[in-house]
Design a protein with these regions (language model features):
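Active-site pre-lysine segment of PLP-dependent enzymes
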Residues: 2, 9-11, 19-33, 45-68, ...
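PLP-dependent aminotransferase-like
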Residues: 1-39, 49-52, 152-179
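Acidic-residue sensor for enzyme active/binding pockets
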Residues: 73, 148, 174
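Aromatic "clamp/platform" in nucleotide-sugar-dependent glycosyltransferases that forms part
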Residues: 42
Length: 179
């Protein structure tokens, strides 16, 4: 955002609200200069998982204001108390939606720089954006080839994170100790 001359405007996710954003407060922050709405779900560091109704409202806000919806879903497999996760892209057919994922969190491959982005929704409105992404990829990005080879085994191999997040799992136990 800053590299392109923009300014990030943050919306609050307060403890008293279960670390969930208030859609009305989010919409109140939108100005004519707003270009995108960023959603981080499941949230880090709180672990909050946004319910379907909240995601639908955020997607509707993005569509109403013709914003690009950017969804950081890197923690989609780290869910406590069997919280259901739903990708916002499934609810965002009327807007351009970029969803981001990767190996670093769920597959504990931090630092490998192996991730992906998927584009969905009103992709016909994203031609200029896609051109910019292709240009950026050609000029700036350098692939982590060994990490790319790890993608298929990581995604198809044994689940190593649920033992930490299910009831009695170390991560769940430790999160309950934090006040």
């Amino acid at each position: 955002v800053i590299l392109n001359g923009g300014r990030a405007v943050h919306y609050p996710c307060r403890a008293q609200d279960g670390f969930l954003p208030d859609p009305d407060a989010v919409e109140a922050l939108i100005t004519p200069r707003t270009r995108a709405l960023v959603v981080i779900n499941p949230n880090n560091p709180t672990g909050a998982v946004y319910p379907r109704e909240l995601l639908a409202r955020l997607a509707a806000i993005a569509a109403r204001h013709r914003l690009v919806l950017m969804s950081d879903e890197i923690y989609d497999g780290i869910l406590y108390d069997e919280a259901p996760f739903e990708p916002i892209a499934a609810l965002a057919q009327d807007t351009v939606c970029l969803s981001f994922g990767g190996l670093s969190k769920v597959h504990r491959a931090c630092g490998w720089r192996v991730g992906w982005m998927s584009l969905s929704g009103a992709v016909e409105r994203a031609a200029d954006y896609l051109h910019g992404l292709v240009l950026l990829a050609a000029l700036r990005l350098c692939s982590n080839v060994p990490g790319q080879w790890a993608i298929v085994p990581a995604l198809t191999g044994p689940d190593t994170i649920s033992a930490l997040t299910r009831p009695g799992g170390l991560c769940l136990v430790e999160t309950q100790v934090v006040p």
